[in-house]
């Protein structure tokens, strides 16, 4: 594998820093690794290399399914091999990589999680590229009574081998109730962040308010999944809410991974059905959500810039030639009090998840 270039990630207050400096990163989450679910064809070096070169992705998430059909409990050797292929490729391409214990019931498989993460820590703990995500999405269970004790046990096992790399912990209610976790954070170990998931078609200002509460309580957040559609993993893209979330993440230095690099016939899939499992996708092979995700990931950068400015009005006489570059969902030009396009043309537009079968995406 290539030499180390990525800076180590550390937590300071409510920020995840890279090499001690403010930073945030954007990239892709793969679909469930489970045998036969379809998304596992993307668990290879060609896909990871393409994401780095074409999407400019700084991170990738290997979502290793645990209990569902074809997952780790049924085939540990096969699923670990897929994860290792992604991790090796990410390190070779100098990307951060999230090793995700992808289940809604991790507390039922504590010993298995400990054994798995011990193996990953022994194998990869020396690389600063590594991020451990020890619980994907807890359901309607207690943070203090269930999730936190599980997390502390798994974190302890990892820290005995890898004392430094970032560990991300899932939060109650499909990793939405970050405010609950922030009121009783894990204090026995350093470099801990908390999982926040959002799907812009469903999750709007009320969830952003929970995120702000957690930040105000001085815990660091990491969005290991986000989608521009609704929480089922399907539905239409909500561009306006997606950009509102981008603004929150950039303003607060929150790194993120888009769900999902897959070609399943659903709104959250970045690729059209039948796309190659080895990269090389043209624009015609991107879905609407995939094109938006690629735009966001490519324009992210490795630092934390100021948020984009709000809409503003400028008025002056004369002829104007305009080019618009914006992270806002819409730009509108007006003549006097009328918007150009109100008589027939639309206003100028700057911008144009689902689990294996039988498993719901969540709330």
Regions found by a protein language model. Give the residues of each.
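Acidic/histidine-rich helix-loop elements
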Residues: 23-47, 66-77, 231-234, 278-281
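Short, solvent-exposed loop/turn elements at domain surfaces
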Residues: 17-18, 24-26, 33-39, 69, ...
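Aromatic-lined substrate-binding rim segments of carbohydrate-active enzymes
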Residues: 41-105, 109-119, 156-162, 238-253
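N-terminal carbohydrate-binding accessory modules
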Residues: 1-59, 295, 299, 304-313
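Extracytoplasmic
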Residues: 309-363
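Extracellular glycoside hydrolase catalytic/binding regions
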Residues: 7-13, 32, 40-41, 96, ...
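A mature extracytoplasmic/lumenal domain signature
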Residues: 29, 64-66, 103, 136, ...
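A residue-level signal for beta-strand positions that form part of recognition/binding surfaces
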Residues: 8, 22-25, 191-193, 318-324
């Amino acid at each position: 594998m290539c030499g180390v270039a990525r800076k180590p990630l550390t937590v300071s207050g409510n920020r995840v820093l890279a090499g001690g400096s403010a930073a945030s990163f954007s990239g892709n989450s793969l679909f469930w690794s489970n045998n036969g679910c379809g998304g596992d064809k993307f668990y290879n070096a060609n896909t990871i290399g393409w994401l780095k070169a074409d999407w400019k992705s700084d991170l990738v998430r290997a979502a290793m399914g645990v209990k569902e059909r074809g997952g780790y409990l049924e085939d540990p050797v096969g699923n670990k091999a897929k994860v290792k292929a992604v991790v090796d490729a990410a390190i070779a391409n100098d990307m951060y990589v999230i090793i995700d214990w992808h289940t809604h019931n991790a507390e039922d498989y504590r010993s298995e999680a400990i054994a798995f993460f011990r193996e990953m820590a022994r194998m990869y703990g020396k690389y600063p590229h590594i991020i451990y995500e020890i619980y994907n999405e807890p359901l309607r269970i207690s943070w203090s009574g269930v999730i936190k004790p599980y997390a502390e046990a798994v974190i302890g096992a990892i820290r005995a081998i890898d004392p430094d790399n970032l560990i991300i912990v899932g939060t109650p209610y499909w990793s939405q109730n970050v405010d609950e976790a922030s009121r009783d954070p894990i204090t026995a170990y350093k470099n801990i962040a908390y999982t926040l998931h959002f799907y812009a078609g469903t999750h709007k200002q009320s969830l952003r308010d929970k995120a702000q509460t957690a930040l105000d309580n001085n815990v660091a957040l990491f969005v290991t999944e986000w989608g521009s559609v609704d929480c089922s993993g399907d539905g239409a893209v909500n561009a306006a809410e997606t950009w509102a979330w981008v603004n929150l993440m950039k303003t607060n230095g929150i790194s993120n991974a888009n769900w999902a690099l897959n070609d399943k016939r659903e709104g959250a899939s970045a690729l059209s059905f039948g796309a190659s499992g080895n990269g090389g996708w043209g624009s015609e092979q991107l879905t609407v959500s995939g094109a938006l995700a690629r735009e966001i990931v490519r324009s992210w950068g490795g630092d934390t810039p100021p948020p984009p400015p709000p809409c503003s009005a400028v008025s002056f006489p004369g002829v104007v030639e305009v080019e618009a570059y914006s992270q806002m969902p819409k730009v509108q030009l007006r003549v006097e009090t009328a918007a150009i396009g109100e008589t027939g043309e639309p206003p100028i537009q700057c911008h144009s998840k689902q689990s294996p079968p039988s498993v719901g995406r969540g709330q």
